[in-house]
Design a protein with these regions (language model features):
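A solvent-exposed interaction/effector surface
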Residues: 1-150
């Protein structure tokens, strides 16, 4: 699996979060349902994205619990029910997951068990564990769908 080390400039997002479990299959169900709710809330708040859309999903560990934070780049207005977050500039290990969502945890396994242990980099994981970047290349469960993992 190919990866790159890239410096990402600081950016800000607004989004919503949901608590996850310790079970992969259940978390896929929770996150899939939550994306539907999040996208509906974007539409209700007049935050729908059209051309050149981008969305992020952050995996956050807080007080021993796991949270999934769906977000978009910050706008001028932060609607009720949305949370604002600043993402600091760091060097990131970036991987592209290509394929169905069903294989996403296999990509994470490779990142954390094969790639990272064989690099000189140590994940900070202070603000979040990792995040996913979604853009026009993402297509639900398509074999050529692309999700960037940072």
């Amino acid at each position: 699996m190919k990866y790159t080390i890239r410096e990402l400039e600081a950016f800000s997002v607004i989004g919503q979060e949901v608590e996850l479990t310790n079970y992969h299959k259940r978390n896929i169900q929770i996150s899939t349902q939550f994306w539907r709710k999040f996208n509906a809330d974007l539409k209700k708040s007049y935050l729908s994205q059209f051309e050149n859309w981008i969305k992020y999903a952050f995996m956050i560990k807080r007080n021993g619990k796991l949270f999934y934070f769906c977000s978009i780049p910050k706008r001028n207005v932060i609607p009720d029910g949305f949370i604002y977050k600043d993402i600091q500039s760091y060097k990131y290990l970036a991987v592209e997951h290509i394929g169905s969502m069903d294989n996403l945890y296999e990509t994470y396994r490779k990142i954390y068990q094969e790639i990272l242990p064989n690099t000189d980099y140590t994940p900070l994981q202070e603000e979040f564990l990792h995040f996913e970047g979604y853009d026009y290349r993402f297509h639900w469960n398509s074999d050529n769908s692309v999700i960037e993992i940072w």
